[in-house]
From Swiss-Prot:
Induction line: Transcriptionally regulated by GbdR.
Name assigned to this protein: Glycine betaine monooxygenase oxygenase subunit
Organismal lineage: Bacteria, Pseudomonadati, Pseudomonadota, Gammaproteobacteria, Pseudomonadales
Top-level division of the source organism's lineage: Bacteria
EC number(s) stated in the UniProt entry for this protein: 1.14.13.251
Residue positions binding Fe cation: H217, H222
Phenotype caused by lack of the gene: Deletion of gbcA and gbcB abrogates the ability to grow on glycine betaine as a sole carbon source.
Residues in Rieske domain copies: 56-163
Keywords on record: 2Fe-2S, Iron, Iron-sulfur, Metal-binding, Monooxygenase, NAD, Oxidoreductase
One Pfam family hit: Rieske
Record function comment: Involved in degradation of glycine betaine. Part of a Rieske-type oxygenase system that catalyzes the conversion of glycine betaine (GB) to dimethylglycine (DMG). This subunit is the terminal oxygenase component of the system. Required for growth on choline and GB, but not for growth on DMG.
Cofactor: binding comment: Binds 1 [2Fe-2S] cluster per subunit. Binds 1 Fe cation per subunit.
Length: 429
């Protein structure tokens, strides 16, 4: 008998859970969070359990596992995860843990296998998770059907792979249907990752997202990014000028001609998709504003499509141009440590050194990511001070941050089993 299965150690985080709910219910929604949300390891553990283990996350792109047996791995808190392409082309996700004695099955970030074989004692699994071989000494009453890999919820749409560690994750199909439609012109099954980077930021994951959700800091911090990016979120942005609105109107005619979706679509505060122009005379997020890849994505014929921006909370933002896409994902490590992964995707037939130069492709966002890292880290250092107290957000410039923290508060209270106040979306988002 497994005595640990009946042994209850209690929940050492229970006092912190109650404190978390109390602080969220009483917080001023126009101010930053109380200090423990950014600094305390106990609240970080609650973030992982109630947000990252219960919400939908972007694990990767379907083009990263194009054929049977292709896999990718990732780490979500203490949980190693495996995503693999099955025999019939399906995408499967499993806990990357052998059912024998718990060793990780796949140790590399990406690869290709015929079967999943544990490196410890060679227990062998089919690509759909079924146990095929467990040696010959497990006893007559051993039933291999009871020891398949533990599955993880997985959905795909528009070339993205979404996973959730929860048994009953929140509904997401309405967003995925829209994402599939908006991504159709890019034909993501015929894309590839040209280059990928991961940087470590000495800051809480929420500070990383907060920094992304506003461009209040852009003029003073991001000269490379502002060579092409128009900082307004869309035409409802309270900062948007009439000239910007006129530019959007002119661009929509061209997008209609190309049958390119562009209308703002939001799904609560968690998801939004919108296509916005880049700076007039530029077509891609490069230092000179020219194409980063000569070969355009999918069925796209005109490189001047602006940038389609995709938000997926809690951890991803994306820019989709005519010639390449950039996918960002945020992975919490500890209360004050976060990984930020950036992937640049191009057409699968684009040839490095001929159609695109990797250094040029990544130049703008390498600089921007490093600038954002420094901003988040300095933000964290200040918040650690005894002098910190929550400060006010600008509803004109920081509405995206307000919306993120409202989403976070609502989901945290919901997942803790607590009631939350009605969350109002701030205009411009």
């Amino acid at each position: 008998m497994d005595v640990t299965s009946t042994l209850s150690l209690g929940d050492p985080l229970e006092p912190a859970r109650k404190a978390t709910a109390d602080m969220l219910r009483s917080r001023d929604h126009s101010f930053s969070l109380p200090q423990p949300f950014y600094c305390d390891q106990r609240l970080f553990e609650i973030d992982m359990q109630e947000i990252f283990h219960k919400e939908w996350l972007i694990a990767g792109m379907t083009c990263e596992i194009p054929a049977k047996g292709n896999f990718l791995t990732l780490q979500i808190g203490k949980n190693p995860v495996l995503v693999i392409r099955g025999a019939e082309g399906q995408v499967h996700a499993f806990h990357n843990v052998c059912r024998h004695r718990g060793s990780r099955l796949c140790v590399s970030e990406k690869g290709k296998v015929a079967k999943l074989v544990c490196p410890y004692h060679q227990w062998t699994y089919e690509l759909d998770g079924r146990l095929l071989f467990a040696g010959t000494e497990m006893g007559a009453d051993f039933d291999m059907k009871e020891y398949g890999l533990k599955p993880i919820q997985v959905k795909t749409a528009g070339g993205y792979i979404f996973i959730s560690l929860a048994e009953n994750p929140p509904a997401i199909d309405d967003f995925l249907a829209t994402l599939e439609h908006y991504m159709e012109p890019y034909d993501m099954e015929n894309a590839k990752v040209a280059v990928q980077t991961t940087i470590r930021e000495a800051a809480n994951w929420k500070l990383v997202i907060e920094n992304n959700r506003e461009c209040y800091h852009c003029n003073g911090s991001h000269p490379e990014l502002l060579k092409t990016l128009l900082e307004w979120d869309d035409v409802t942005d309270p900062r948007a000028s009439q000239a910007f609105k006129d530019q959007v109107a002119a661009c929509t005619s061209a997008w209609d001609a190309e049958k390119i979706p562009y209308a703002h679509a939001s799904f609560g505060l968690r998801n939004r998709i919108v296509r916005m122009p880049l700076l007039d005379g530029t077509v891609s997020m490069t230092m000179d504003g020219k194409q980063g890849s000569k070969k355009l994505m999918g069925r796209i014929k005109n490189p001047d499509l602006g940038s389609m921006r995709i938000l997926h909370l809690p951890h991803s933002w994306n820019h989709c141009m005519g010639d390449h896409l950039i996918v960002f994902t945020v992975w919490p490590i500890s209360a004050q440590e976060t990984l930020v992964t950036t992937k640049w995707l191009v057409h699968k037939d684009a040839v490095e050194g001929v159609d695109y130069d990797v250094a040029r492709l990544r130049e703008v966002w390498d600089a921007t990511n490093d600038q954002d890292r420094r901003l988040a880290e300095e933000n964290q250092r200040g918040i650690n001070s005894d002098a910190y107290q929550p400060g006010p957000y600008s509803k004109t410039y920081e509405f995206g941050v307000i919306n993120f923290l409202d989403w976070y508060s609502e989901r945290m209270l919901n997942n803790l089993g607590e009631e939350s106040a009605h969350v109002r979306k701030v205009a411009g988002s």
